[in-house]
Structure formats: C-alpha cells, structure tokens
Amino acid sequence: MKNILLATALLVISMYGQSQTKVFKEVNQDVSSEIKAIVQDGSLVGYVLFTELEKASDKTFNYRVTIMDENLNDIGTIKFEDEKLLLQQVAFEGDVLCLAYIKSNFIGKAFDKVRDFRKQKAAGVRDSIFTQFVSLDGKIINAHSIKADITSDGEYDHVKKKVKGEGELKHQVQLKNIAGTGFAMFYGDENKNQLVTYDLRGAQIIKKRIKDKGDDFALLTSGTDVYILVRTDSHDKTFGSEYSMLAYRPSDSTTLPKYKLTDKRGNALKVIAFNNDPVTGKPFVSGNIIERNALKYDNVKEMKRGAYVGVFTINFKSTRKADVTESYSYWNDGSAPMFMGNGLISEKDAFARQTLSFRDYSGNTYFVGSSVKKKMRWGAIAGAVITSPLLVGPVLFLAGGTQKSKTSDVVVMKQTKKGDLTVENSFKSDAGKYFQAKTPVDVYDVRSYYTVTNPDEKISYLICYDYDNITIYNVNEKKVMRTIPRWKGSLETSVFPAKEGHILVAQYDKKQKSRSFSIEAL
C-alpha cells in the first residue's frame, strides 16, 4: 500500500466506534511522505510513515520514520541523515522492524540545471540496497548496504523546471519475515538476482545469487523456509508461462530440490496466487491452465476457441516430490458440468477470466474475475451489407471486426479439495463498455481484487475495485456487504487491507488538500 503526501502535518486524531482516523494536510511542497504497511506472516500489524524532510547538505537529506500500530497509534519515531532513500518494503519479526530502501546519489534527486545532472552522472552513479533494522522504541539496531547495478537516466519535470534522476531495479525489492529467525530479501538488478537473509540482530546469514533465469520472481516465507517462484514466459507462443519453485532453509543453509510446475498434459500455466494456506501455513500456488497452442493474445476470440482449459492448485509441504500435492480441474474434458468445453459458463453465456485466487479455512480454492461477454456487431454488419456496392463501405464498417466484447458480472468459482469445480456466485459491478473482440481483455478489464480475512470467525471478504465503485463481498455468506463510491464531489476514496477483519479507508479531499486514514471493521 502506498500513498504519497506532498507534505504532512497531523491535524486530528479521533476515535469513534471501532474506527480510528488520522488526517494529514499538505503544508510544504518540499517535504514528502509515504505510508507503508508493516507485514508479519502475511498479516498487517502496523504502518510506517516515512518522511523526507529538508536537505541536510548538498548530498544528504534529513529523514523521519514514524512507527504506528494497526490502529494508527504512534509507538516510535526515529530521525536520521543519509543520501537519497527510496523506501521499498517493510517487514516485522521479534520486535524488530526491517526497512529496505534503494539508496542513491542520483535516482530520485532533482537537479536545478541540466549541466548539474550531466555532471553528477559523469562523476559516477552510486546505487545500493540499504536495509535498516529498528526496534519498536525507535533505536537503529543495525544497517547494511549492498551495491546494486541499476540503469539510470533523467527525466525533465516541466512543473518544477528541474531534471530528476530516474532508474529502477530489474526485479523490485521483496522483503518477508522468517518466523522466529529474521528476514528474507530478494531483488534483481542488471547483472544478478539475489537472495539475502538476516537474523534479528540485523546480521547477514545468507547472500545467495539466484542463477535460474526468469521473467519474474516472487518471494514467500513459510515457517523457517524461504520459497522463490520463478516465471519464464514463452514470448513467442502463448500467454501462459512455465514455473519453477525454489526453496531454501536458512537455519542450516540447506537448498531444497527445485520443483517444476506442470499439468502433465503439456499445457502452459498462469499463476495468479502464491501464498500460504490460512490453516496449514504452508505454501500453495493456484491459477489458470492455458491450452498448449493458445495464441499470445488474451482476448475473447481466443477464449471462444478454448484458450483457457481449467484451473489448478498445488500445495507444498516442501519442494520434494513426496511433499507436493496437485489438483487440476479441466472443463475441456467434460468433468465440470457448469462449463462448456471452451470455458463458457452455460447459465451466464459468458467466459470467466480469473485474476485472483485465495484459499478459505476449509481447504477450498477460490478463483475470482470478470465474466466476459461476446456479441455480434449487427449494426456494422448491416451497414456493410447496405453499402456493399460502394466497395469502400464494407471496409469502413467492418474494420473493427464482426464481434465485440465487454466485462460483465464478477464471477466467484470454487475448487474443492477433491478438485470439483463450481460457479459459487456472481455479483454486479460497474458496467463495462464494448470493445473489438480482438482487443486484449487487459485493456478494458480494469477491475482489481484483494481479500481480507477474519480468522476468529473464519470469514473471507473480497474487495473489488472498479471504474467508479469499490465493492465489499462476503465470500461465506455470498452477498455484497457494502458499495463505496470512489469519487464523490471533491473526495477521492481508496480502500486497503488493514488488520485482520478490518479495512483502511483512505480519502483525499482536493479542496482541503488533506488526506484522512481510518480503520474500519467489516
């Protein structure tokens, strides 16, 4: 979660019911802050407000880190001076907070003149991954810097009339806690992908270069084990990918066997969830099964042809074959009666395109996404027929094809532990507009999702972001609990995960130039 504030000054802290609210007001354009969630074992346990204050010198800045609990109460503050820092990730374990930054003498810095920018770049760019270990009372326990090779350049800011140094890692910093042990961090620069682990004193345990090649990497910790999911895209054949699971045990420096994810029918996969099971605490991977000869374009024409052939869930106790259980559910073999062979949901006359997956407390895997409808462009076809003697007319009318598509209801599917697949429910969201059927669905399916859970009551909630509204859906009760407008007058509202069973509602008032954050129970 990230919200950039041009500047912050705390105006009010108020308590009402089960909600606490903080309001921040913009007061100085030279001060910037961002708020990030503190995560432990996948659960949000607090927040960090990272503020860049005034310059301390030509090369350094003053910084303030405010530590807040899950109810937005301040519990500690640290102030320090350093080069330009860009906060990436925050994790918590054993009363120690680990913050990971990109440190640079170039990236993120603003230069008044182009010649100053060129002079700095010619003098040499120094980039590093900077980790800081902080106690809850605001004391810095330890800190480390690892040199990073980042391709950098400049971008001219036409508003501030300055040149800003730009650059980013090839694979962004990922930081997780290791239960009872410390922290694991992964990042990839231009020359290497690296896993680094630390103990609770901030001492480095492992620094390991990941030699496996991939287009993307995802880090997850489970107990004392560290997992990395490697994705390799086909690039020239299908929009599915190949995946491998790497695993390490920092406690004794063990490297576990690599496990390749495959459905045994030669199909490609598309992972949409890599997380820990809420009951066992062990990793699972779930997603779509893509037909082996599917084209690279993820559009409704390919869906009609049968590009999506099912869904899968793979459970890991470790990456040893005996510790892995797989569940593949296909609709192209007739084993899922609610689906046609090409994935069309019979009762909805629409294709389900799953973009989120999660587990419940009964061992079921859920798949969520927009239903996609296809329709003939009868007006264009009629126009082409009428103007057929003119030759040019049909070309103009049929330039967009004879079919169109759009997103419709949100569909919730369930795969049981036995692999049975059903459509559990659907609910309405903002109405989408029609696009040419050959248009990739990513272009017009703007919905995004995440989940919030209540472990005590074993309830899962689904949060759906759409064009104009945010919908909160109770998965257990199969009903919409609340709909929140994203835009109302001068207010812009966003909703983020908070502590278990709660959400964080963030509102920006354009007129008052203020931001408020409140924790609300579901």
Segments (PLM) and residue ranges:
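Surface-exposed loop and turn segments in beta-propeller and other repeat-based domains
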Residues: 82, 143-165, 259-268, 321-348, ...
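Start-of-domain marker
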Residues: 20-86, 187, 241-243, 280, ...
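Short beta-strand elements that form the blades of beta-propeller/WD-repeat-like
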Residues: 43-58, 90-121, 132, 174-189, ...
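Beta-propeller blade signature
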Residues: 62-71, 115-139, 195-201, 240-254, ...
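Bacterial Sec-dependent N-terminal signal peptides
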Residues: 1-24, 522
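Blade-loop segments of beta-propeller domains
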Residues: 71-116, 145-165, 207-224, 229, ...
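Repeated scaffold domains used in trafficking and secretory/extracellular systems
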Residues: 30-39, 80-92, 150-174, 212-223, ...
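Long, internal scaffold/assembly segments composed of regular secondary structure
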Residues: 219-232, 237-364, 369
